[in-house]
Amino acid sequence: MARILGVDIPNNKRVVISLTYIFGIGKSRSQEILSKAKIDENKKVSALSEEELATIRKIASEYVIEGDLRREVAMNIKRLMEIGSYRGIRHRRNLPVRGQRTKCNARTRKGPRKTVANKKIETK
């Protein structure tokens, strides 16, 4: 496996697909990196030379990816929570942020149901 920016990318796949294993690089950015490096997208990672891998590393290091990007996203969410915006409050309460309904569904964000004891009213 080739190692680019601290991430092992698979040898048996095409370069354009393998680069998407790096957090922050999708298909379009992968194509952009390969066009700048003048490398064929259909080439397998195992067929790349060390010079080609070095150029990919150099070009990819210009972008905000992996740990820096994760940190930036976390800081953006933290900032929203600190300023008390609507989105920040939704993050703090672990509710859907983008306007989804919560009366039913939203189980992924809310987590498993919290059952309330003694809710049934006994009839006499």
Swiss-Prot record:
What GO annotations for molecular function exist for this entry? rRNA binding; structural constituent of ribosome; tRNA binding
One GO biological-process annotation of the entry reads:
translation
Q: Which UniProt keywords apply?
A: Ribonucleoprotein, Ribosomal protein, RNA-binding, rRNA-binding, tRNA-binding
Family named by the database record = Belongs to the universal ribosomal protein uS13 family.
Q: Could you tell me the superkingdom of the organism this chain comes from?
A: Bacteria
Q: HAMAP family in the record, alphabetically?
A: Ribosomal_uS13
* Region of interest called Disordered, as start-end residue ranges on this chain: 103-124
Protein name per its UniProtKB record: Small ribosomal subunit protein uS13
NCBIfam families from the UniProt entry: uS13_bact
Function in brief: Located at the top of the head of the 30S subunit, it contacts several helices of the 16S rRNA. In the 70S ribosome it contacts the 23S rRNA (bridge B1a) and protein L5 of the 50S subunit (bridge B1b), connecting the 2 subunits; these bridges are implicated in subunit movement. Contacts the tRNAs in the A and P-sites.
- Supply the source organism for this entry: Malacoplasma penetrans (strain HF-2) (Mycoplasma penetrans)
Oligomeric state and partners?
A: Part of the 30S ribosomal subunit. Forms a loose heterodimer with protein S19. Forms two bridges to the 50S subunit in the 70S ribosome.
Q: Where is the composition biased (Basic residues)?
A: 103-117
Q: Which GO terms describe its cellular component?
A: cytosol; small ribosomal subunit
Kindly indicate whether the keyword Nucleotide-binding belongs to this entry. Answer: no
